[in-house]
Every structure is written in structure tokens, then in C-alpha cells.
Amino acid sequence: SPTKVKTISKILGPDYIVKSSVGHIRDLPRNTKSIPSKFDSKKILWGAVKPGNFENIYVIPEDRKKIVSELKEIADTAPEVYLATDDDREGEAIAYHLKEALEIKGEPKRIKFNEITESAVTKAMNNPDTIDVGKFKSYEARRTLDRMIGYEISPKVRDLGGAFISTGRVQGPAIRLIVEREE
């Protein structure tokens, strides 16, 4: 957020450029029409996935391309890149995707803090970490399952009940539990 950027900039001083990605910058395609042309969307069968033959395809949504371009321009000239996102799976995914999309040379420094105070930011800057790939893979597994199940099941559910109905990995079992409880 602009307020966080301003506060962190003030703490770090003029030697640092602080910018925000404003959240996620890459995602799985929303539908097969969103799959980049270098991939054959006819070969991607979201419902028939076997271990070992599935590869996630990430795209930069149109509304994120400008910010990615701006961040890449800064990262290309920076002697070091620090990635400060939330210390959870979503934050790790944002950091991972920033590293990939910005084509950061070398390993970016991953910093984490739970409050934006001078002591917390300084401590994080003095003790950088690396991107936790395990935490990213955890995010990726959840996101992939959500998308695969949603792609397959939501259109069928909409056919039964209306344009704005969807279901997924969590919704389906949760609804089942509610139905069983009510019976």
C-alpha cells in the first residue's frame, strides 16, 4: 500500500527505492483462452492430470503488466533486490513470482517483518533470508487444485443453478457437510 511504501522509504532513507507490487503479479490462466499462444490449450486437460505430466503455466494479467514493467526496470539497475511480502504462503508466492517475472539476477534477499517500525525493518534488513520454495510449493499446490477443480466443476454447477454459482476444493466438501448436518 502507498502508506506502507512511504513509511518503509522513510525508515530506509534515500539509498533505497521502495516500490509495491500491490499484491500478486502472476496467476494461473482464468480459462483456456488465457493460455499463452506458445502452449497448445487443446493439450491442457485440467480434469485429466496425471502426476508427472502437469506443468503450471503462469500469466501476468493485463492489469498487472504496467507495474511488472516498472518494477523490472528498477530491479535491472539495482545492486541488490529485497523482497518484503507477508510471511505466509501468499507472501511467499508474491516474492517467488516477482523473482521470476522480474528476471532478478542472482538471489534476491527475502525480508520479513510483522510490523512497520524502524526496529522491525532494520532487523529484517540486517537478517535477510531467501525465498522459501517449500512454502511457495504449498501455495502452488493449493492454487493449482483450486483452479483445476474450479475449471471442471464450476461450469457444470452453473448449468444446474445459474450464472454466478461456483464450487471448488473447499466449497464442495463444506456444502456436503452442511447438507449432511441438515438431513
Predicted regions and their residues:
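Prokaryote-biased recognition of long, low-complexity C-terminal linker/tail segments
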Residues: 142, 146-183
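Intrinsically disordered, low-complexity regulatory segments
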Residues: 2-140
